[in-house]
Amino acid sequence: MIQVLLVTICLAVFPYQGSSIILESGNVNDYEVVYPRKVTALPKGAVQLKYEDAMQYEFKVNGEPVVLHLEKNKGLFSEDYSETHYSPDGREITTYPPVEDHCYYHGRIQNDADSTASISACNGLKGHFKLQGEMYLIEPLKLSDSEAHAVYKYENVEKEDEASKMCGVTETNWESYEPIKKASQSNIPPEEEAFYQRYIELVVVADHRMYTKYDGDKTEISSIIYEIVNTLTQIFRPLHIRVALIGLEIWSSGELSKVTLSADDTLEAFGEWRKTVLMNRKRHDNAQLLTGMIFNETIEGRTYKSGMCNPKHSVGIVRDYRTRRHFVANRMAHELGHNLGIDHDRDSCTCGANSCIMSATVSNEPSSQFSDCSLNKYLNYIVRYQSTTRCLHNEPSETDIVSPPFCGNYFKEVGEDCDCGPPANCQNPCCDAATCKLTTGSQCAEGLCCDQCKFTKKGTACRPARGDWNDDTCTGQSADCPRNGLYG
């Protein structure tokens, strides 16, 4: 049994009201300095893990006590995760680093239903959390006292510049790619289709400008990408999409595709490189280029609308122009949203925040939420283009999840019948969130052949016909929808 470690942090808080300090996120005003004192409560004889599966931090923000609950993001890496860089003479070097005991967490604030947190615990606490609708950042201070941390509101980070920035996908060009083959009408109601789990196996590429920007420090670049993807996985959870990092590549010896001031040309070249090189080397669903290039026309990212699963068009490019990882994760989520058929938000779209993920202009305070319009667009996309987005159905096998099973992390792992998340978040009547077992009388909790907790009748169509092939049908013995030879 995995022991849950509860860590209580007692903090001495020293506010620096009106003062300014240069932190990793930039120049910050009005921050608080906190000194964590870690109290560990492990059962007698329990083994101390380097990075615990669950942690709890108690501290004060603006004089008020808060309790931060954290759980390790166990779906962050795939089993065959790899990292690739290049020697000075251009020779490819690929490694398979152990990632089981990583230090990246998701979390929430106790008694705040709308709270979120994305934290790295690798060297102190670093990341962001939302409390009472406001975004806070936390990071270790680079002082001789290694226990000192800074906590500050996102709004107190001085902006690099106030020029309006934008996504490169505009109304005049976002139809540049649409899947040619459209699925016939599904027998599955759209409201049910929205709740089926999908998966994006992601490769992130750091270009040579990123490599030189960070002085050739591959470890730092990798950590940056881990933080970005950790936030990315949290952003896509409401869409029932699990994002797993399957590969990371650093162009350490030079650019491997053309990177220019033109975002369009850069995207075109990167898509061609993905199709002809990367896909032959690494199985994945989507690739994102993180670049140090400053594009023309204040463009921060570019992609192909509805390009997901296409060999050349399931790509995006994102500029790494800020040290705030949450901001870059927001832009990458935005481009992935376009890949999934989502348009820019209109003025009438809402998400409960000042700005939403799919806003056409880049907000200085990024959102972590998709709007109501985005959710509807995504649902329309997956219903309309089922046959061309089948890569999203490639669920990792239970043995592909590299960490030990942990009930409540949304991943069905070895020994579990289901996993609908923590009890407070679970909305699946077929699954007991406390045990990750099926509820009494239930045969299944999810799947194309699961209806009201029971296996669908044998012969029921679960995936519509494609071309000359007949419908895929349920067996009556499983919640899975078996694929015919065309898609097997």
Swiss-Prot record:
Gene Ontology CC entries for this record: extracellular region; plasma membrane
Other comments on record: The disintegrin domain belongs to the long disintegrin subfamily.
Role, per record: Zinc metalloproteinase-disintegrin VMP-II: inhibits ADP-induced platelet aggregation (probably by binding integrin alpha-IIb/beta-3 (ITGA2B/ITGB3)) and degrades fibrinogen.
Chief location: secreted
Annotated Disintegrin domain residues: 404-488
Coiled-coil intervals: none
Residues annotated as binding Ca(2+) 1: 201, 285, 391, 394
EC number: 3.4.24.-
Protein's name in the database: Zinc metalloproteinase-disintegrin VMP-II
Keywords: Calcium, Cell adhesion impairing toxin, Disulfide bond, Glycoprotein, Hemostasis impairing toxin, Hydrolase, Metal-binding, Metalloprotease, Platelet aggregation inhibiting toxin, Protease, Secreted, Signal, Toxin, Zinc, Zymogen
Domain of life: Eukaryota
Disulphide bridges: 309-391, 349-373, 351-356, 407-426, 418-436, 420-431, 430-453, 444-450, 449-474, 462-481
Annotated ranges, domain Peptidase M12B: 198-396
Family annotation (CDD domains): ZnMc_adamalysin_II_like
GO biological process terms on file: proteolysis
Binding residues for Ca(2+) 2: 409, 413, 416, 419
Subunit structure: Homodimer; disulfide-linked (disintegrin).
InterPro entries the record matches: Disintegrin_CS (IPR018358), Disintegrin_dom (IPR001762), Disintegrin_dom_sf (IPR036436), MetalloPept_cat_dom_sf (IPR024079), Peptidase_M12B (IPR001590), Peptidase_M12B_N (IPR002870), Reprolysin_adamalysin (IPR034027)
Matching Pfam families: Disintegrin, Pep_M12B_propep, Reprolysin
Residues the entry annotates as binding Zn(2+): 334, 338, 344
Active site: 335
